[in-house]
UniProtKB/Swiss-Prot annotation:
One of its GO terms (cellular component) is extracellular region. Its main location: secreted. This is Scolopendra 5928.03 Da toxin. Keywords: Neurotoxin, Secreted, Toxin. The keyword Protease does not apply. Expressed by the venom gland. It comes from Scolopendra angulata (Barbados giant red centipede). GO terms for molecular function: toxin activity. The keyword Membrane does not apply.
Length: 14
């Protein structure tokens, strides 16, 4: 994710 939200972490690698 390009924006750090509460739902999604900053790392999209996983």
């Amino acid at each position: 994710a390009q924006t750090v939200r509460x739902d999604i972490p900053h790392h999209e690698x996983y």
